[in-house]
């Protein structure tokens, strides 16, 4: 098993050097630059997995034509997934989804009013035929992981990275459980 995994990793490294089997890009779009701190974990996660990431500010209400144009040309510009974060009325993900067949992941951003519930409802309640996959309020890290999983459907190297990440999480939980059991034994 380890030999097989090692061989696959070597093949992925060679393939990436040749430009073979490269994942598509992920667009991370925010409705306002004030949303940037919420998106930092997603940007770091995507870049950490070697996924080319383009980050932009675009408003569903202030720059609707630019948002529509970006979304309409996203596929031909090499994008595979769009992540959209917005607070309050939070129509950005829906506007982007209306103009593309690419998967759109919405991140409702917590604002000072209603603790992000308004953004959650605006992002998740989409009409039939215009789906937006919605993560938790301020759930940027999960949005990045979901985007990576979508791209991994056609990228075995990325799938390996995701498997490695899940193994690391599993090992982390096992270590925490071990430490807990030691504390319980001392009671």
Regions found by a protein language model. Give the residues of each.
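Single conserved hydrophobic/aromatic residue that forms the stacking wall/gate
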Residues: 1-15
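Glycine-rich phosphate/diphosphate-binding loop of Rossmann-like nucleotide-binding domains
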Residues: 24-62
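Active-site-proximal loop->helix
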Residues: 42-43, 68-71, 98, 115-127
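N-terminal beta-loop-helix "entrance" segment that forms/cooperates
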Residues: 55-76
């Amino acid at each position: 098993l380890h030999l097989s995994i090692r061989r696959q990793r070597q093949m992925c490294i060679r393939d990436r050097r040749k430009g073979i089997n490269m994942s598509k890009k992920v667009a991370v779009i925010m409705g306002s630059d004030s949303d940037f701190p919420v998106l930092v974990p997603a940007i770091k996660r995507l870049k950490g997995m070697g996924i080319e990431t383009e980050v932009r500010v675009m408003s569903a209400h202030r720059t609707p034509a630019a948002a529509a144009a970006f979304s309409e040309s996203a596929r031909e510009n090499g994008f595979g997934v769009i992540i959209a974060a917005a607070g309050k009325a939070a129509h950005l993900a829906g506007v982007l989804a209306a103009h593309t067949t690419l998967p759109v992941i919405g991140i409702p951003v917590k604002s000072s009013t209603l603790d992000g519930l308004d953004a959650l409802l605006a992002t998740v309640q989409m009409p039939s035929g215009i789906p937006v996959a919605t993560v938790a309020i301020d759930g940027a890290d999960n949005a990045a992981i979901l985007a990576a999983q979508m791209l991994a459907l056609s990228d075995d190297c990325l799938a390996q990275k995701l498997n490695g990440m899940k193994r690391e999480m599993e090992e982390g939980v096992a270590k925490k459980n071990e430490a807990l059991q030691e504390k319980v034994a001392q009671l």
